């Protein structure tokens, strides 16, 4: 009998080498059961601070804490063996100084066992990215629309329509690449600019509301699965519609309980003969 084939976990270096090759498949994951389902199909799983909105009902990602990210990072690591797992650095955990960023990123790496961290920001964060990378922490960048800065940009909207925005996003992506990030998310950016940046920089771009020309794509899993119902961004395609199925299952369960059809004989334990 031949031994089972063991797939090694993908590393940030492997992800970086996928630039211009096979598109990078990425989704968010927050829990062990879902991570197990996604792991065989994804190159990179992102433990995103979007969990604040899709799991906890927050209005934005700003209230997500480092402890929350570590707890969910641990859960995702328990459910994966193949995908590269990256954990978001939440708002306030890295912006103060590069030393603060290293201290908190090191804690994330140590306590979760993840493969790297993601942080938002462009030119203003390049020094921090370089500081982390030089100290052994792989960094996944994030430019374009940055949800942690939603209060300063006037809400969730696409960027790159004016010359100032185009120049800023282009410079941001170049700065993050030059600082040593292994890849960069481009979010909510007009298609021609995302396409241009992908050709311009030498690390993979992972698009979300960007361009099919990006080196990979990422979506929030709850959006992709049709579980998150509060709103649907234009860039989301629902590959399933699980929310109605969950509701229907709960309705059927409630009906059977109230009618005393559940549990049935096959779901209960009988007494042993002679007991």
UniProtKB/Swiss-Prot annotation:
InterPro entries, alphabetized: Pantoate_hydroxy_MeTrfase (IPR003700), Pyrv/PenolPyrv_kinase-like_dom (IPR015813), Pyrv_kinase-like_dom_sf (IPR040442)
Keyword Metal-binding in annotation: yes
Major subcellular site: cytoplasm
Catalytic reactions on record: 3-methyl-2-oxobutanoate + (6R)-5,10-methylene-5,6,7,8-tetrahydrofolate + H2O = 2-dehydropantoate + (6S)-5,6,7,8-tetrahydrofolate
Keywords linked to the UniProt accession: Cytoplasm, Magnesium, Metal-binding, Pantothenate biosynthesis, Transferase
Residues that, per the record, bind Mg(2+): 49, 88, 120
Cellular localisation: Cytoplasm
A matching Pfam family: Pantoate_transf
Biological or metabolic pathway of the protein: Cofactor biosynthesis; (R)-pantothenate biosynthesis; (R)-pantoate from 3-methyl-2-oxobutanoate: step 1/2
Entry binding sites for 3-methyl-2-oxobutanoate: 49-50, 88, 118
Active site: 187
Top-rank taxon: Bacteria
EC number from the UniProt entry: 2.1.2.11
UniProt key word Translocase: no
Cofactor notes: Binds 1 Mg(2+) ion per subunit.
GO CC terms of this entry: cytoplasm
Any one GO biological process: pantothenate biosynthetic process
Swiss-Prot/TrEMBL cofactor(s): Mg(2+)
UniProt-listed SUPFAM superfamilies: Phosphoenolpyruvate/pyruvate domain
GO molecular function, one term: 3-methyl-2-oxobutanoate hydroxymethyltransferase activity
HAMAP family, A to Z: PanB
PANTHER family recorded: 3-METHYL-2-OXOBUTANOATE HYDROXYMETHYLTRANSFERASE
Subunit relationships: Homodecamer; pentamer of dimers.
The protein's role, per its UniProt record: Catalyzes the reversible reaction in which hydroxymethyl group from 5,10-methylenetetrahydrofolate is transferred onto alpha-ketoisovalerate to form ketopantoate.
Protein name (database record): 3-methyl-2-oxobutanoate hydroxymethyltransferase
Taxonomic source organism: Brucella suis (strain ATCC 23445 / NCTC 10510)
Gene behind this protein: panB
């Amino acid at each position: 009998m031949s031994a089972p084939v063991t797939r090694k976990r993908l590393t940030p270096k492997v992800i970086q080498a996928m630039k211009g090759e096979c598109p990078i498949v990425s989704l968010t994951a927050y829990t062990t059961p879902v991570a197990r389902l996604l792991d065989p199909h994804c190159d990179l799983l992102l433990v995103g601070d979007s969990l604040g909105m899709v799991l906890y009902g927050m209005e934005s990602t700003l209230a997500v804490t480092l402890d929350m990210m570590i707890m969910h990072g641990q859960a995702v690591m328990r459910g994966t063996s193949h995908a590269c797992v990256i954990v978001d650095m939440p708002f306030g955990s890295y912006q103060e100084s590069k030393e603060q960023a290293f201290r908190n990123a090191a804690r994330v790496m140590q306590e979760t066992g993840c493969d790297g961290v993601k942080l938002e920001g462009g030119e203003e964060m390049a020094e921090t990215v370089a500081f982390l990378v030089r100290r052994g922490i792989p960094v996944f960048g994030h430019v374009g629309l940055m949800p942690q800065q939603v209060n300063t940009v006037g809400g969730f909207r696409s960027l790159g329509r004016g010359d100032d925005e185009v120049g800023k996003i282009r410079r941001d992506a170049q700065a993050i690449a030059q600082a040593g990030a292994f890849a960069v998310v481009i979010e909510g950016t007009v298609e021609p600019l995302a396409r241009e940046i992908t050709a311009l920089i030498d690390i993979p771009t992972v698009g979300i509301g960007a361009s099919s020309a990006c080196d990979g794509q990422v979506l929030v899993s709850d959006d992709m699965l049709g579980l998150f119902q509060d709103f649907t961004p234009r860039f989301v395609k629902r590959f399933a519609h699980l929310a109605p199925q969950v509701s229907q299952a709960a309705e059927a369960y409630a009906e059977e309980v109230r009618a005393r059809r559940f549990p049935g004989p096959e779901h209960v334990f009988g007494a042993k003969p002679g007991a």
